Design a protein with these regions (language model features):
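A short acidic, glycine-rich active-site loop
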Residues: 268-269, 318-324
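Short, basic/hydrophobic alpha-helical segments
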Residues: 333-339
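Divalent-cation-assisted or electrostatically stabilized phosphate/pyrophosphate-binding catalytic cores
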Residues: 324-330
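Short glycine/proline- and charge-enriched loop/turn segments
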Residues: 309-317
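C-terminal amphipathic alpha-helical interaction region
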Residues: 294-296
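Hard-cation-handling environments
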Residues: 300, 305
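Metal-cofactor-binding active-site regions of metalloenzymes
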Residues: 2-290, 342-344, 348-360, 364-470
């Protein structure tokens, strides 16, 4: 019987173990998409206790706790103590078996704090006190944890109106880990609520110094901010969309739609889709001109529970996988850009695993050797799919229909400084997948050195470094 969470965790064969320990484990981390709070890195934030670093803002854990019958006050409440919240999490953990939370929890405790005990009500107090004491040491502050996990670069998620002051400070401090911004302009195309859109345009005008009265002014203001982001090291954009937008439109139509929504009038569904199409094309053109990589995270149905959304706001654990029909629109959108030679490097992340083969074949339509290997990427399993089963399905689809060897690999997509073991989890899963193929004679054992050096190390680190030019 294999042991849980030992040095060979998830590695079912000797070949998988060799690939992981000799190749994957030693590679630095490039976390090219995350939601860390930049201020925490700039200030080298010290976390008061284990709850502060582990439970705050973690909607994965909150969903599990709610499902386990835990009252909301122990998830997001303001009147419960940090220990009380942790105690309820510890009560929940034994019931998360076969959920990836069970693996992540114990990997994080082991790799960050050296804790090998299982977290449960009996061990909760000891583990909480031990980890909280360690968190007071400088090597467990925000920057210390990034050093501990050998993080070479992180890309945060930032709005075009953000000052990026914390990124600038980190750069000026000479911190070894590079913290780069990512351009996330979703609010600039969120025209569903005219008052909110107008308020955002006013912010954009203020920070860019461009007076906004017409659509062309919006693009000018965004160009100013795009160039500023580039000056601070930005190399990626990111777009959170339900589906791809690729409507036919004229410039006159977009000008009129902007005037309508900016004037406070509600748009029709057709007008909304046309405007979103135009904005995505403008964003894509900016990225192509700047040599950036654009990312598309699509397919989530957000804020399903209106009662809890009104109480807690977004990103609190009430989102789910959508079932949008996206193939034709995705194809049309990329072709709109490619036929004018304006298609930048692109990473596509689907949330519904139904779309794995769709995305894996779509990326093959728009590869271009002028950009190097793997111009268009099938992104790693995202959100509900960034677990063993989801990652294996994504990699199997990519292997079958594309080139796994040119994959840029894993990212945390996380708000937590304890989430870097997700890279280890991915690397173990990758090595197990490839190692099992070698053991079964599906790949030549004589090529194990090439596989380890070129493919495993490439996917874990080198492909991303070459792709993003960090």
């Amino acid at each position: 019987m294999k042991q849980f969470n030992d040095d060979n965790f998830l590695l079912q064969t000797e070949t998988a173990q060799r690939l992981y320990h000799d190749h994957a484990a030693k590679m630095p981390i490039i976390d090219y998409h995350c939601h860390l709070i930049p201020e925490y890195v700039a200030s080298d934030h010290r976390f008061d206790n284990l709850s502060k670093i582990w439970l705050e803002g973690d909607h994965y854990k909150w969903r599990a706790m709610r499902t386990n019958g835990v009252d909301e006050k122990y998830c997001t409440g303001k009147d419960t103590t940090d220990w009380e919240k942790f105690e309820k999490w510890a009560e929940t953990v034994p019931y998360t078996m076969r959920n990836p939370l069970y693996h992540w929890t114990h990997l994080e405790l082991k790799t960050a704090f050296g804790v090998t005990k299982l977290l449960n009500p009996a061990s909760a107090r000891e583990i909480y006190d031990h980890c909280t004491a360690l968190l007071q040491r400088p090597e467990y502050h925000a920057r210390g944890l990034m050093r501990r996990y050998n993080v070479e670069a992180v890309c945060t998620t930032d709005d075009p109106v953000d000052s990026l002051e914390h990124h600038i400070k980190v750069r000026e401090d000479g911190f070894a880990t590079r913290m780069l911004p990512t351009w996330r302009p979703d609010k600039a195309m969120a025209v569903e609520v005219p008052a909110d859109f107008r308020a955002y345009m006013e912010k954009l005008s203020e920070v860019s110094g461009v007076a906004i009265t017409k659509f062309a002014d919006v693009i000018d203001a965004l160009h100013v901010r795009h160039e500023f982001f580039g000056s601070v090291g930005c190399r990626l954009s990111d777009h959170g969309i339900e589906e791809f937008y690729a409507e036919d439109y004229t410039q006159a139509e977009i000008d009129a739609i902007f005037n309508k929504v900016y004037g406070g009038q509600t748009l029709t569904p057709e007008e909304i889709r046309k405007f979103k199409t135009a904005m995505l094309v403008e964003f894509a053109t900016m990225d192509h001109e700047a040599g950036w990589t654009q990312q598309f995270h699509y397919g989530a149905i957000r804020n399903n529970n209106s009662r809890m959304f009104g109480r807690l706001g977004p990103d609190t654990g009430f989102d789910s996988i959508g079932d949008f029909a996206v193939g034709r629109q995705m194809s049309k959108f990329f072709d709109m850009l490619d036929r004018n030679d304006r298609l930048a490097k692109t990473i596509i992340y689907n949330l519904n695993p139904r779309d794995n083969e769709l995305v894996a074949t779509m990326i093959g339509n728009f590869q271009d050797g002028r950009y190097g290997a793997g111009k268009i990427q099938f992104g790693s399993g995202w959100w509900f799919l960034d677990q063993k089963d989801g990652m294996e399905k994504q990699m199997n689809a990519l292997s079958t229909l594309g080139l796994l060897s040119r994959f840029v690999g894993m990212l945390t997509d996380s708000r937590s400084f304890l989430s870097y073991p997700r890279h280890e989890y991915f690397r173990r899963t990758l090595c197990n997948l490839v190692g099992n193929d070698i053991e079964q004679g599906l790949l030549p054992a004589s090529e194990i050195d090439f596989i380890g050096r070129e493919i495993i190390e490439g996917i874990c680190y080198r492909n991303a470094k070459d792709y993003f030019k960090f």
